[in-house]
Amino acid sequence: MTSSVDSRMADALLDDFLAFTLTGSAPSATDGACAAGAVRWQWLGDGLLALEPAAAEAADTARASVLVSAGVHGDETAPIELLSMLVRDLASGALPLACRLLVVLGNVPAMRAGERYLDDDLNRLFSGRHAQVPDSREAPRATQLEAAAAAFFAAAPAGAARWHIDMHTAIRASVFEQFALLPHTGMPPTRTMFEWLGDAQIAAVLLHTAKGNTYSHFTAEHCGALACTLELGKVRPFGQNDLTRFAPADRAVRKLVSGATGEADVPLPRVFTVIDQITKQSDALELFVAADVANFTAFARGTVLAQDGDYRYTVTHDEERIVFPNPSVKPGLRAGLLVIDTTRETVAALV
């Protein structure tokens, strides 16, 4: 029999998943029902919550499995707040749940500290790369998040849709305020994903051309998920976000988990494909762009963008755009991506 203490802790967990997680509490009962019995929930650990419809239906075999994550960088607060509100509305019954759902708050210790990360960028430690930094405080969390995603998708109905939406905000401004990054899988992007991104009013999509170590790369490659990383605006402290700026993406996530149909004939995002990157060779790296240059700023052929000892990066296409320029990364890491517009050919090849 559930005690009143268990019930109060469950209410606190579900009513404000963010606040509950920041306290470091663990619920005395780790599973239960909510939404007037319509939803089952299970607490899987710090910042990890699974929810699914309680009623067994014939449609269960086609029920989608959706992982929605935020806070992989601990200071990217707006998506974390949106995800906590999503849990609240599902638990209260204000929003129906039509899928298996795994909610993930990523780097919880960094969230508590108000930092991007403590030792290492968590979003570069997936697909086993955490084994290279065993002393990092982020390494155990990467291991835990990989295991949680793998177990969640392993239990998915065969043939049913699998999604992973990883929500972030960016350090710097962007020519396209809200954009998405799709992991490289060796297959053309899907029209299903592009139409969902269009419904979310995502202005641009960046296509990776090599495997990476991000959370969405992991779930796409190892779990077979339709996965994307969303960049939804600027980093701000908890409580200082204008969440109305995130409304289209929030609505699209809510449609996905509630089984609602997206808007028809939405404009598809522009598409940019990675053609090179600036890799920091040493602490002597010079990036010849303004410190506050916006993501997707364009540069003409012949422009020298970086120099590091004998290494120099010069624009070789008529126009290249820089994304995520960051000269302060550790040597050996990416200090910027270079992309070109490939909208026409990408949209023509959608599957």
UniProtKB/Swiss-Prot annotation:
Superkingdom classification of source: Bacteria
Reaction(s) catalysed (UniProt annotation): N-succinyl-L-glutamate + H2O = L-glutamate + succinate
Active site residues of this protein: E231
Pathway the protein acts in: Amino-acid degradation; L-arginine degradation via AST pathway; L-glutamate and succinate from L-arginine: step 5/5
GO terms classed as biological process: arginine catabolic process to glutamate; arginine catabolic process to succinate
Cofactor(s) listed: Zn(2+)
Residues reported in the UniProt entry to bind Zn(2+): H73, E76, H168
Database matches in SUPFAM superfamilies: Zn-dependent exopeptidases
UniProt cofactor note: Binds 1 zinc ion per subunit.
One function term, GO molecular function aspect: succinylglutamate desuccinylase activity
EC number: 3.5.1.96
Keywords, in A-Z order: Arginine metabolism, Hydrolase, Metal-binding, Zinc
Family that this chain belongs to: Belongs to the AspA/AstE family. Succinylglutamate desuccinylase subfamily.
Record NCBIfam families: arg_catab_astE (TIGR03242), PRK05324.1 (NF003706)
HAMAP family named in the record: Arg_catab_AstE (MF_00767)
Purpose: Transforms N(2)-succinylglutamate into succinate and glutamate.
This protein's name: Succinylglutamate desuccinylase
Gene that encodes it: astE
